[in-house]
Every structure is written in C-alpha cells, then in structure tokens.
Amino acid sequence: MIYDFRKKSKFGYTTGSCAAAGAYSALYYLKFGKKLSYVEIENLNGDKLIIPIEKIEKCGNKAKAVVIKDAGGDIDITNGIEIITEVELKKGKKDVIIKGGEGVGIVTKNGLQVKKGEPAINPKPREMIRNNLLKLLNDDEVVEVTISIPKGKELAKKTLNPKLGIVGGLSILGTTGIVRPMSNEAYMNSLAPQIDVALANGYKRLIFVPGNIGTKYAKQLLNANDDEIIEVSNFWGFMLDKAKEKGVEEILIFGHAGKIIKLAGGIYNTHSKVADCRNEILAAYSSLFIDDKEAIKKILYSNTTEEVIKILEEKGVLNDVFNFIAKRVVERLSERWKGIKFSCIIINMKGEVLGSYIWNKK
C-alpha cells in the first residue's frame, strides 16, 4: 500500500519514519548532490511511505535533514516537532550505524526493547532506517546516522519516559511507521513497557492505576515503588492483555472511584468518549443496600462521583457499596483474564479508602 503524506491525511507517520526519511534524503544529497523535497521509503510490511522533507543542508563531509512529525488524525505530544538526522559517509564494509543525539533519551533501566545505556531508538525503527539506507550504499561504504530532537528533552518530561528510566529526551518509536487515526496506538505502546520494567526489576505483584491520583496514593498508602506502579490511563483492556501475555501473576487495581467503577460494569476503555455509565453502575449497586427510590434517583442524576459518595455516606452504606463494587471488579477481571490473581482498592480524591476486595481463589 502507498501512503502519500505530501497531502493532508487522516494517517500520520511515526518518529521512526521521520528519522528514516530524513536519513535517506540526507544520504542521497551527500552521495548525489540533489536535494529531495520528499522521499519514498519502505516500512517493514512492504508499504511505501512518501514523506516530505522540510530542509536539507550540507556541513563539510556531513549532510543534515529536517522532517516535521505529522501525527495525522491521532494528535500526540510529538505532532509538529522537528526530527533531525545527520549522516556521515565513511569507507568500510557496507553498514549503517545509528546513534542518538540531542533530545533522544538514554535507557537507564532493564526490561525495555533497547539495552541499558543505549539511545532510546527502538528495534523496528532501527531496522527500517537500516533497510532503506542500505539501498543507497556501495559495498565499501559505511553511513553513520545521528538522530536529534531539538525539543525532545523538554517534551519528554510530559511523557512516561522518566518513569520508564529513559532520561534526557524522547524515544524513536514505530512498528509499522504509520500512525493510524484515533487509534491511540503510539500512546498505548508507550504504556506497555512499564510492565517489562517492573518484571525486569523483580516485582511479582503489579499495581495498576488510572493515572496521577492513583500513583500518588499508591506511594503514600501502600509504600509502593515507581517501578511496580503501572499507569494504564484509560486503556485497561489493552494493558491487562499485555500483562497476561507477559505472564504477570498478580495485579492490584488501585485508584479513584470515578475510573474504577467502570470496570465493575465491564468497561475496559474508560474514556468518557467511549463509555461512561458511572451513575448507572453506582445506582445499580447502591440499590442493593438502599431501599429509597429518591436516593437512587439522586445518584442517577448526580454530576460527580463525589456527590454520590456524600449520598452514600448519609445513608450509612458507603463502604458496603464500594466493597461490593471492588468485589465485582475482581470477579469481572478474573473471569476475563484467567490465571491472574486480582485485588481491588477504591479511593476518593483525598486518598481515603472507600472499598476493597481481595479474592483468594486460586
């Protein structure tokens, strides 16, 4: 298939594709003296990607190209940033050497696809860069490629890279080189390595949290370490599939009620655009403990989960309801992800425990 990114598309291209396209255009200029306004590269599936080149310049015996990252319809933090590739041609046995420059992170923890101490350029992008550049090389030529991201160090602070032990910049990512619209593919794939890091550091029980609130209180209440806390965002189904695939045996579901209650309803992508039903779920479970139609109606029409918590407190059934919800979360997840031992703790915005359940079934 051909993806032509010279025109606006719902598809986008990854940082790995940017690096491959930039390296190809810079090497082409170095060898043949022609500046290309776009290049056609091939991904590992055999698809053709036509990617525009923003700028090319020569610096002595080196050439440098700039490619602007375009995320298409799946906008992420890297959309619109510059990916710069500098190439230098040397004599030697035909080869492609890939290095990380300014703004590309360095891996400092075990468990990731890239070895500790290496620049965070994943294997698939490396392979794509290598395959495309080898087409331009003679048998006695070696090309050295250095990838830089000018805003990488600053932007990396807003990603999971610091938690994963990738310091000083962003990662060069991409499996197919293509960003698919509204797939959240890049973001989801940035979440999954947390599991690898945790397992590599010997953690047997992982703590799955929706985000910052869960992380904060898991540290305070459970004395948990960063590496055993796995932030899943809204992608519970995806992350639990990954945990199962990687052989995780025990998971504690921990976090604010607003997200966790959706799991009790069998909702495994908890983004409000996908599904909500918080009030409906709360009303259904509360009705098991409250014989008051007006109170149930108030729950159904509440604006926030915190409002529901107040109603349940007034009725004296707060812990009963949330203990039961925690139990249903454990039962639901255990039915679908067999072989993993689940527990669940639900908290409010202050980190106070509303309900919990530990299922000891083997």
Swiss-Prot record:
The keyword Methyltransferase applies. Pfam families: CbiD. InterPro entries: CbiD, CbiD_sf. GO terms for biological process: anaerobic cobalamin biosynthetic process; methylation. Keywords: Cobalamin biosynthesis, Methyltransferase, S-adenosyl-L-methionine, Transferase. Belongs to the CbiD family. This is Cobalt-precorrin-5B C(1)-methyltransferase. The lineage of its organism: Archaea, Methanobacteriati, Methanobacteriota, Methanomada group, Methanococci.
